[in-house]
Amino acid sequence: MVVIGEKFPEVEVKTTHGVIKLPDHFTKQGKWFILFSHPADFTPVCTTEFYGMQKRLEEFRKLGVEPIGLSVDQVFAHIKWMEWIKENLGVEIEFPIIADDRGELAEKLGMIPSGATITARAVFIVDDKGIIRAIVYYPAEVGRDWDEILRLVKALKISTENGVALPHKWPNNELIGDKVIIPPASTVEEKKQREEAKAKGEIECYDWWFCYKKLK
């Protein structure tokens, strides 16, 4: 089982787009990727999730992020299900789906709950260095909110690029709105620098350990 901060395991997978090597397939293009598992093809909640992801695909791609699905179904089941979605819902699924029919990758990533034979609704966000940045699990009975995952990706990218943290419900936080949090000072000198920056109007603070600013 892997955890946040670890390198995503190198593995070759069979998908609806052919054999893909992870994480290289995406990282060599300088892209992040979202690997998400679903319990089974031809099930109602999973169908709504794939429809929702496809509808937001361009938003993810504008951020340099590619989705890739996974379940323990065989590839022909994925293909038939994608055809059903296109014929009945009018949406063509453009991203690949992994056919992990032996459950080997799912087991390695901890996607299969104890005592189960199918995957939970797991989400792994992996950056362009192949590092796992976030892991989210939903139970089989509750579908994912792709808008929240999109928010999470945006926040992770901003944090990575600017060395800041993002508050609850960013960019609509009740205390600081769309501003970002400056990491707390860890030395006396840094504390002094925060206080000086506040006095100059460069940042805002509730206290020296809780400072924030508007991104330029």
From Swiss-Prot:
Substrate binds at residue 121. Signal peptide: none annotated. PROSITE patterns: THIOREDOXIN_2. Residues 2-158 form the Thioredoxin domain. The active site is at residue 46. Disulfide bonds join 205-211. It catalyses: a hydroperoxide + [thioredoxin]-dithiol = an alcohol + [thioredoxin]-disulfide + H2O. Its EC number is 1.11.1.24. The keyword Plastid does not apply. The active site is a conserved redox-active cysteine residue, the peroxidatic cysteine (C(P)), which makes the nucleophilic attack on the peroxide substrate. The peroxide oxidizes the C(P)-SH to cysteine sulfenic acid (C(P)-SOH), which then reacts with another cysteine residue, the resolving cysteine (C(R)), to form a disulfide bridge. The disulfide is subsequently reduced by an appropriate electron donor to complete the catalytic cycle. Thiol-specific peroxidase that catalyzes the reduction of hydrogen peroxide and organic hydroperoxides to water and alcohols, respectively. Plays a role in cell protection against oxidative stress by detoxifying peroxides. Homodecamer. Pentamer of dimers that assemble into a ring structure. Belongs to the peroxiredoxin family. Prx6 subfamily. This is Peroxiredoxin. It comes from Pyrococcus abyssi (strain GE5 / Orsay).
